[in-house]
C-alpha cells in the first residue's frame, strides 16, 4: 500500500474542481461506451445504404472494438509518459473528429477506417478516465467515482440501441455519429478547465516509448480477437491458425520486454500478486457477464418463445440494473472497504449464476430476469471494488499503463466469453435428446453454461482469498 510520502504528489495534483472533473471524465467514458453499442442498431440500414452483406457491415462494429482492445495498454503507457490530461483531451479531439468523419463517410471502407480512428480515441478515453479518477480526485472519493464511471459505461451500453434507433428514424444514420460532436466538445471544455496541469518529469527521467513491444502486443491481441470473433462458437482451421499466431506473438513479446530498458509492460507487474490476480479476476468475471449477453437472447427466444421486441426489452434489464448499481457500489467501497465489497460482489454474482442455472422453465421471464439482475448487480459491486483495489495501489507514473491493462483484461473477458460461453450453450443443447423439444433443449444449454459460470466465479473467489492472505495490507504493492 502507499505510504504518506508516496501519496503526497497525488494529493498535490488533485483537482480544485473535482465535481467538474468527474463530470468530464464520466462524459468521456459514456461516449466511448456509446460508440460500442449505438452502431449495432444501424447495421441493417448501413447494409442497405452501402449495398453490403452482413459480414461486411459487421466490421463497422469489429473495427472499433479491435482498435480499443489492441491499443488500451499502449495508450496507457503513453499517458504515463506525455501526461494523462494532455493525452485524454487529445483523445477526445480524435474521437470527436472521427465521429464527424463517420457521419460524412460516402462508402463502407471510409466508414470502417473512420471507426478505427474513433476506436483509438475511445481507447484513450477509457484508459485515461480510470487513471485520472485515481489521480485527480481525493482518495476518499475514489470508490464513488469508480462506481459512477461504471454506471456511465452501463448507461452508454443501454442507451445506444434506443438512441440510435430514434436518431436513424428521425434524422438518418449519420446522426448516430454526429451526436458525439457536441458531447465531445462539452467534455473537452470541462476537462480542460477542471483537470490539474500535468506535472512534467525531468527530461532525463522520461522513458522512451517501446514501439517494438507495442507492435508485438497489438499483433498478439488482434490475432486473438480475430480468432475469437471470426468463427463465433465454431472453431475452424483459420481460428486455430490465428490462435497459434497469437501465442507466437505473445512469446516474442514477453521475451522482448525482458530485453529492453523501458518496456511497455514492466515484467514486475506480473510478479505483484495483487495486480496479476486483479487482472485475472476481471477477465473471469467479465467472461461470466458476457454469457448473459450471448446466451440470453437464444434462451429467451427458443425456451420462452419471446419475439425479437420482447427479447430486446428483457435484455435491457441487465444494463439498467448495472446503471442503477454503479454509484451505490462505489459508496459501499468507500464505506466498508474494497476488499470486503469485492468478496460481496463475488458472492452476489455466484448466487445469480446458481439461480440462472437452476431456474425451472415454468417461472418464465421472471426466472430469467431475477438471476440476471443479481448477476449484474454483483458485477457492478465487484468492478467498483476491484478497480479501486488495483488503482489505489499503483504509483502515479504507472497509473496509465495499469489502467490500460485493467481495460484489456475486461475486453479479453468479453471476447473470450462470447466464444467460450456460446460454445458451452451449444454443447449443452447437443447433449439433450432431440425429442425433448426446443424449450427443454435450450434450457439444458442454459443450465450447463451457468453451472460452468458458477465455477468460474468460485475460482475467482479463491484467487481473491489467496491474494488477500498473501497481502496483509489488502492491496497491491506499488509498481
PLM region descriptions:
Residues 2-194, 325-340, 344-350, 354-361, ...:
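Transmembrane-helix bundle of Major Facilitator Superfamily
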Residues 181-200, 218-230, 245-260, 460-468:
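C-terminal membrane-cytosol helix-exit motif in multi-pass small-molecule transporters
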Residues 70, 124, 219-222, 291, ...:
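Residue-level signal for the membrane-embedded core of alpha-helical transmembrane segments
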Residues 56, 109-117, 172-179, 207-210, ...:
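Interfacial loop-to-helix junctions that mark the boundaries of transmembrane helices
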Residues 18-34, 39-41, 54, 185, ...:
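12-transmembrane solute porter fold
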Residues 138-139, 196-204, 226-239:
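Alpha-helical transmembrane bundle and helix-membrane interface signal
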Residues 12-16, 140, 188-218, 258-273, ...:
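Flexible interhelical linker loops that connect adjacent transmembrane helices
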Amino acid at each position: 500500500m502507499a505510504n504518506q510520502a508516496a501519496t503526497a504528489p497525488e494529493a498535490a495534483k488533485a483537482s480544485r474542481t473535482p465535481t467538474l472533473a468527474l463530470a468530464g471524465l464520466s462524459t468521456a467514458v459514456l461516449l466511448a461506451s456509446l460508440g460500442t453499442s449505438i452502431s449495432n442498431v444501424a447495421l441493417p440500414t448501413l447494409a442497405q445504404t452501402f449495398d453490403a452483406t452482413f459480414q461486411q457491415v459487421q466490421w463497422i462494429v469489429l473495427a472499433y472494438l479491435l482498435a480499443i482492445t489492441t491499443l488500451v495498454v499502449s495508450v496507457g503507457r503513453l499517458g504515463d509518459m506525455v501526461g494523462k490530461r494532455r493525452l485524454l483531451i487529445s483523445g477526445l479531439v480524435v474521437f470527436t473528429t472521427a465521429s464527424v468523419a463517420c457521419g460524412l463517410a460516402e462508402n463502407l471502407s471510409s466508414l470502417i477506417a473512420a471507426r478505427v480512428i474513433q476506436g483509438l480515441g475511445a481507447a484513450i478515453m477509457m484508459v485515461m478516465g480510470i487513471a485520472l479518477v485515481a489521480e485527480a480526485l481525493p482518495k476518499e472519493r475514489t470508490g464513488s467515482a469508480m462506481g459512477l464511471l461504471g454506471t456511465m459505461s452501463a448507461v452508454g451500453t443501454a442507451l445506444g440501441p434506443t438512441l440510435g434507433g430514434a436518431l436513424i428514424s428521425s434524422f438518418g444514420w449519420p446522426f448516430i455519429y454526429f451526436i458525439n460532436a457536441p458531447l465531445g466538445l462539452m467534455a473537452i471544455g470541462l476537462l480542460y478547465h477542471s483537470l490539474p496541469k500535468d506535472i512534467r518529469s525531468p527530461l532525463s527521467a522520461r522513458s522512451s516509448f517501446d514501439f517494438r513491444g507495442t507492435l508485438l502486443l497489438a499483433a498478439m491481441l488482434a490475432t486473438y480477437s480475430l480468432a475469437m470473433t471470426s468463427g463465433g462458437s465454431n472453431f475452424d482451421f483459420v481460428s486455430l491458425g490465428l490462435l497459434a499466431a497469437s501465442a507466437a506473438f505473445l512469446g516474442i513479446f514477453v521475451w522482448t520486454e525482458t530485453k529492453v530498458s523501458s518496456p511497455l509492460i514492466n515484467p514486475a507487474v506480473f510478479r505483484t500478486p495483487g495486480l496479476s490476480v486483479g487482472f485475472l479476476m476481471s477477465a473471469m468475471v467479465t467472461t461470466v457477464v458476457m454469457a448473459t449477453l450471448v446466451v440470453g437472447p437464444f434462451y429467451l427466444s427458443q425456451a420462452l418463445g419471446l419475439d425479437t421486441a420482447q427479447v430486446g426489452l428483457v435484455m435491457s434489464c441487465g444494463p439498467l440494473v448495472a446503471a442503477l448499481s454503479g454509484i451505490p457500489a462505489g459508496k459501499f467501497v468507500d464505506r466498508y472497504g474494497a476488499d470486503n465489497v469485492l468478496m460481496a460482489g463475488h458472492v452476489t454474482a455466484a448466487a445469480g449464476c446458481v439461480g440462472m442455472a437452476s431456474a425451472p422453465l415454468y417461472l418464465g421471464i421472471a426466472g430469467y430476469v431475477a438471476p440476471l439482475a443479481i448477476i449484474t448487480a454483483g458485477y457492478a459491486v465487484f468492478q467498483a471494488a476491484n478497480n479501486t483495489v488495483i488503482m489505489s495501489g499503483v504509483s502515479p507514473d504507472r497509473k496509465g499503463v495499469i489502467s490500460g491493462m485493467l481495460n484489456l483484461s475486461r475486453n479479453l473477458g468479453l471476447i473470450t466469453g462470447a466464444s467460450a460461453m456460446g460454445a458451452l450453450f451449444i454443447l449443452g443443447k447437443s447433449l439433450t435428446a432431440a425429442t425433448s423439444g426446443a424449450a427443454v433443449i435450450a434450457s439444458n444449454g442454459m443450465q450447463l453454461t451457468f453451472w460452468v459460470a458458477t465455477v468460474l466465479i468460485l475460482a475467482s473467489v479463491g484467487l481473491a482469498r489467496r491474494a488477500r492472505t498473501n497481502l496483509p495490507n489488502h492491496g497491491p504493492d506499488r509498481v
